[in-house]
Regions:
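Conserved N-terminal Rossmann-fold NAD(P)-binding element of oxidoreductases
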Residues: 27-29, 52
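Glycine-rich phosphate/adenylate-binding loop
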Residues: 2, 108-115, 119-221
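Hydrophobic/small residue at the entry helix of a nucleotide-binding pocket
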Residues: 33-34
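Glycine-rich phosphate-binding loop and adjoining beta1-alpha1-beta2 segment
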Residues: 46, 51-89
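Aromatic pocket-lining residues of Rossmann-like dinucleotide-binding sites
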Residues: 41
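Hydrophobic residues within alpha-helices
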Residues: 37-38, 81
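A structured beta-alpha segment of the ubiquitous adenosine-cofactor-binding alpha/beta core
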Residues: 74-115, 120-126
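N-terminal charged helix/coil linker that caps or initiates catalytic domains
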Residues: 1-26, 144, 164-165
Length: 221
């Protein structure tokens, strides 16, 4: 085993680490959640990572987005993710798509993936992504943040969990996001994703919610 993955052992088996190197994961969004998800997957040793985002960095991203810095303001988020991938783990095949997830491209983006990570910032795109994953038979690991709170869930094909989390007419209540909420949420998502990729049991149809202000964790549905 390569030395860079040695500290995975004990938590993961050598066989599981080898399995991860043969997996492909799509990260939808390269901003607050996406940057941390990509970082964790790169260091974990997933073989191929695809990432899509049509946005560019602006000053309001600096408080929480791992890939944002004064030097990246105005540059594309997907391109910044690709540069980070080359720096952190050049052995990982990284495919960057400088476009938003849309009805036209969602099916192609998730095609051939073993898991999809939701790092989107709007409900409409989440619904599109959930439909594409269901049609492709790919597990979706949902994640969302707001202020002090973070949530994550595994959505398996055939389960309309996204529809239950965001019923028709739902709106995002706030754009507030603190520096520590995205990495906490990304850690939950990556842990769930790792269990799926390695064949470990994972509970589906549950929404895990963390309140970091009151230090409470609950499971809904």
């Amino acid at each position: 085993m390569e030395e860079r993955y040695i500290r995975n052992l004990g938590a993961l088996t050598e066989e599981e680490c080898a399995v991860l190197r043969g997996k492909t994961v799509f990260v939808a969004g390269c901003g607050g959640l996406g940057g941390y998800l990509i970082e964790m997957l790169l260091r974990l040793g997933v073989g191929e990572i695809r990432a899509a985002d049509g946005d560019v960095f602006e000053a309001s991203n600096l408080n929480r987005q791992l890939l944002s810095s004064p030097s990246t303001l105005g540059s594309g988020k997907a391109a910044a993710a690709a540069a980070r991938a080359r720096e952190i783990n050049p052995e990982v095949r990284f495919v960057a798509v400088s476009d938003f997830v849309t009805e036209k491209n969602a099916a192609e983006l998730v095609k051939g993936c073993d898991a999809v990570l939701d790092a989107l910032d709007n409900i409409a795109a989440r619904r599109l992504l959930a439909v594409a994953c269901a049609e492709a038979g790919v597990p979706l690991i949902h994640g969302a943040i707001c202020g002090w709170t973070a949530q994550a869930a595994v959505v398996m094909p055939g389960d309309d969990l996204i529809g239950r989390i965001y019923p028709e007419g739902s709106r995002l209540s706030s754009k507030a996001s603190l520096s520590f909420t995205p990495p906490f949420c990304a850690a939950m998502q990556t842990a769930l994703c790792t269990r799926i990729l390695t064949g470990r049991p994972v509970e589906t149809g549950r929404l895990y919610m963390a309140d970091l202000l009151d230090m409470e964790l609950e499971s809904l549905f």
